[in-house]
Amino acid sequence: MEETLSSQKLTEQNGMTVTPQDSIMSLLYQARWGDGSAYLKLADCYRDGIGVKKDFFGMITMAHMAEWRGAINRIDDYIYGLPDGSDYKTLFLLMDSYRSYIQEDPDSIEQELRTRDSPEAKTLLGMITVDQGDTISGINKIKEAADQGCSLAELLITIPDWKGRPRADATKLAIIAHRVPLAYLILGDLYYEPDDNGKSNMQLAVEYYMKAEEHAVLDRHGAERVLDYYRNGGNVQLTEDDVKRLELIVQPKSVETE
């Protein structure tokens, strides 16, 4: 991950500008301390490939975190603020339209996705194909997209069985977590909650939750679990700052206004 943002690429979103003085590590640090505007800047970085690999799912993840932290009322506020003609804006709106009008004819959405030569479009097309009952063809599309570097597709193929209640494969998640940090949060949930044999591993779950916190993607549920484990004498070492950040995550959000 590059430390310094390219001075050639400046993005402006919701009245904020990503500047060369910002770095990914600096923005992550600010986000971990509850700065919703830092999440919006991180979303912009993933959108434009500034300091990080350009990534649709990374953009969506950070925009969702900005919403949860109260920087925006809803993720749509961020999406609709993107420049017209943005591929990521179009992809999000196409998928949103499919979810909203799933009972209606989805052919036009599928046709639009097929015209877009990107792994992200292929992933969304694969998801629709699975949803329509052709699991094998859909998963093959998603696997192709994963091979082409789509992080959302990489995350989706960690689910070995799409029938019934999907449960991700922990080994596959661990392999991609350094590229798809949200996998750390999913791993935490997997190990915290009892498996099919009724067993859980809270210590390992907490370790993964804290890795998610390092990448600014820990949610309230995970933070509550870490604090509960820690305060009940669990085998985890937290600094005073760790505890403060976890407590900030647990706090109810309040929408930021200027």
Label the predicted regions.
Residues F57-G70, A146-D147, Q203-V217, V243-P252:
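TPR/TPR-like (Sel1-like) alpha-helical repeat modules
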Residues S23, M59, D105, I109, ...:
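Single-residue signature of alpha-solenoid repeat helices
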Residues K41-D48, D77-G81, L93-S97, M127-D131, ...:
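Hydrophobic face of amphipathic alpha-helices that form TPR/SEL1-like repeat modules
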Residues S6-K9, Q21-I24, L28, L40, ...:
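Alpha-helical tetratricopeptide repeat
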Residues R32-D35, D48-I50, E67-I72, P83-D87, ...:
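Short helix-capping/linker turns of helical repeat alpha-solenoids
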Residues E224-E258:
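Terminal, low-structured helical/coil segments at or just beyond the last alpha-helical repeat
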Residues L27, A63, I109, L113, ...:
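Hydrophobic/aromatic packing residues within the alpha-helices of TPR/SEL1-like helical repeat arrays
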